[in-house]
Amino acid sequence: MPLTRVDIEKFNKVLIVYNQNSGKQLFANMFARVNEIYKRIKSILGAKRTDIIDIKKFADLDDIAERIYVEQVDWVIIAGGDGTIRAFIEKIKKKKCFPYISVFPTGTVNLVAKELLMSEEKKKWVKRVSKGIVTPVYLGRTNGHVFLTVTGI
């Protein structure tokens, strides 16, 4: 996949969306890990441009997608697993809203994050995304649902 770059300093609004239930509790300190990412991004872009919200259930994604559309969020950081990412992409695509999306892996398998070479280590992750490296992802669709890596029967 071709790599390009974007200047994250030009983003007006960044939203971190994290799923507190992803990862089957593999990361007992998940909120602490995600909060550290939030603090680091906030220190780069400033408090007024950076916000964080948690997903209690996938149904919350409808309201989050609406918020992203209304507030014209430039960059969404998804802290979750493959299921969270897929569900989020499905909702945001329906809004015809396409912010830059980064993945901070906190799921069980994290296949999407692995394919994008995203580290689970906070400092390495922030260093990479702060460089503004963009990797296009091509969505697939089967039985009316979006998929990013694999689909099955």
Language-model features and meaning:
Residues 20, 79-81, 104-106:
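Glycine-rich beta-strand-to-loop/alpha-helix junction loops that act as flexible
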Residues 75-78, 100-102:
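Short, conserved beta-strand segments within well-ordered enzyme catalytic domains
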Residues 15, 44, 55, 94-153:
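Catalytic core of DAGKc-family lipid kinases
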Residues 57-58, 81-82, 118:
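Short beta->alpha junction loops/turns
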